């Protein structure tokens, strides 16, 4: 298989630099690009052996499969599984060893001079255990980072990602980085806000080490459709009033949003604390109480309107998953053995996914082109990554994303918040182009 012209440019960019990052929309082919660059670097003796760090599911199922397509001469070993299996992979003669980030703190003595960080945002926190373990163990001359969500959650994320690639880009100290580009807005909580123009300045600094693929590289279009539905608002309004009276919003906004989002989907968890058999011990039980089936009824109509075309349905809560399974007994999840292969073969009509498990690197573009968000994740990164399972290199049809929103509920605020966060990402990508 051959790379597209824009992908060849990205592969050349990596090959020509020891320290570099590829920023690309989800599905633009970052893995294929990197495999070709790795192959060339190994062939020319620039690197003797590569280590790839990736999210677990991607390490297990993506890199070896993609290597067979794009760089079949590469010897790939996957260091995932039991300690014995991981050690065997590290001790093999493979050109490339792929492992997951969770294994960082138990890595054996390393003999790699090249490293690839698949989904670089996993290392955005320079004070995190992953970052510290990696910084201590690995000193490779060639460091490449891949991500589709560089600044999804704000400018502060950029520092850690750049530091692990090249400390000369933004310096060694996050404190100095904050002092230069941010203003302290809340000393008690350590909250910082970017100074005017900081985003543009930071992106200009890191531009020489960064290759950006824009959404224009995709051959297919992404269409986003709001699917609106109504519910009886009596219970919803009552709950909002109770939260205000009890002052819960000021203490734990996440609890408020979670409860209201549940109710916008038609149910709520009744949480009770129950005394356990052991004195002084308590357990928490959650029983779903249903008030409305409006979203699921509208989902039925939507699937019928699309003539039951193969569709991914993204959910947030376990009770949503349970109801989906009740309504659609033949629906499958990512936990079902061989489901990815069956989906890509067009043999799965409904695939139920949680955004946290359907993120980085999964190739689902061959089995369908429609995705429904029954409820939305709060994270822009999770939202984009989930859509990117379909809207990626290799997709032959326009992708249709349906976002189900209950009118006059927190659904609308979550949807608006995702758009607000997107502004930061769009500015960053545009500045680097």
Predicted feature residues:
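Conserved helicase ATPase motor motifs in RecA-like P-loop NTPase domains
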Residues: 26-27, 141-155, 163
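Conserved Walker A/P-loop ATP-binding site and its immediately adjacent core
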Residues: 33, 46-69, 154-157, 317-318
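Conserved helix-turn-beta segment of the N-terminal RecA-like "Helicase ATP-binding" lobe
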Residues: 58-82, 168
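A conserved SF2-helicase RecA2
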Residues: 378-433
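SF2 helicase motor core recognition
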Residues: 104-109, 153-155, 319-323, 339-345, ...
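Conserved Helicase C-terminal RecA-like lobe
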Residues: 1, 15-19, 25-29, 33-42, ...
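Inter-lobe coupling linker of SF2 helicases/translocases
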Residues: 98-104, 109-112, 128-140, 145, ...
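Conserved motor-coupling elements within RecA-like helicase/translocase cores
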Residues: 84-97, 339-350
């Amino acid at each position: 298989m051959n790379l597209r012209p824009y992908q060849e440019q990205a592969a050349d960019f990596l090959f020509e630099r020891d320290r570099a990052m590829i920023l690309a929309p989800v599905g633009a082919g970052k893995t294929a690009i990197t495999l070709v660059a790795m192959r060339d670097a190994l062939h020319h003796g620039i690197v003797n052996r590569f280590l790839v760090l990736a999210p677990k599911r991607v390490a297990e199922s993506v890199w070896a499969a993609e290597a067979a397509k794009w760089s079949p001469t590469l010897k790939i070993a996957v260091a995932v599984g039991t300690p014995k299996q991981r050690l065997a992979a590290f001790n093999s003669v493979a050109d490339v060893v792929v492992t997951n980030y969770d294994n960082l703190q138990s890595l054996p003595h390393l003999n790699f001079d090249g490293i690839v960080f698949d989904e670089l945002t996993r290392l955005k926190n320079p004070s995190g255990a992953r970052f510290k373990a990696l910084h201590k163990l690995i000193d490779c001359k060639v460091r490449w980072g891949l991500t589709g969500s560089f600044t999804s959650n704000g400018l502060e994320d950029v520092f850690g990602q750049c530091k692990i690639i090249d400390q000369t880009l933004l310096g060694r100290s996050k404190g100095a980085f904050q002092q230069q580009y941010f203003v302290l807005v809340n000393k008690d909580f350590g909250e910082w806000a970017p100074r005017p123009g900081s985003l543009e300045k930071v992106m200009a600094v890191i531009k020489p080490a960064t290759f950006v693929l824009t959404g224009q590289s995709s051959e297919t279009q992404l269409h986003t459709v709001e699917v609106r539905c109504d519910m009886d608002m009596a219970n919803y309004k009552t709950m909002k009033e109770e939260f205000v009276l009890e002052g819960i919003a000021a203490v734990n906004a996440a609890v408020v949003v979670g409860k209201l989002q549940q109710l916008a989907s038609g149910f709520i968890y009744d949480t009770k604390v129950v005394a356990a058999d052991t004195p002084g011990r308590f357990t928490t039980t959650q029983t779903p109480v249903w008030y409305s089936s409006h979203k699921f009824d509208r989902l039925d109509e939507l699937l019928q309107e699309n003539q039951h075309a193969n569709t991914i349905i993204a959910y947030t809560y376990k009770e949503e998953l349970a109801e989906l399974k009740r309504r659609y007994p033949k629906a499958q999840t990512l936990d079902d053995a061989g489901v990815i292969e069956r989906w890509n073969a067009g043999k799965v009509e409904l695939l139920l996914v949680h955004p946290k498990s359907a993120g980085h690197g999964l190739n689902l573009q061959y089995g369908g082109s429609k995705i429904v968000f029954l409820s939305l994740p709060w994270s822009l990164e999770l939202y984009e990554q989930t859509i990117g399972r379909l809207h990626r290199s290799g997709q032959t049809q326009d992708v249709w994303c349906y976002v189900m929103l209950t009118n006059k509920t927190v659904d609308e605020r979550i949807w608006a918040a995702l758009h607000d966060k997107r502004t930061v990402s769009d500015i960053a990508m545009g500045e680097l182009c």
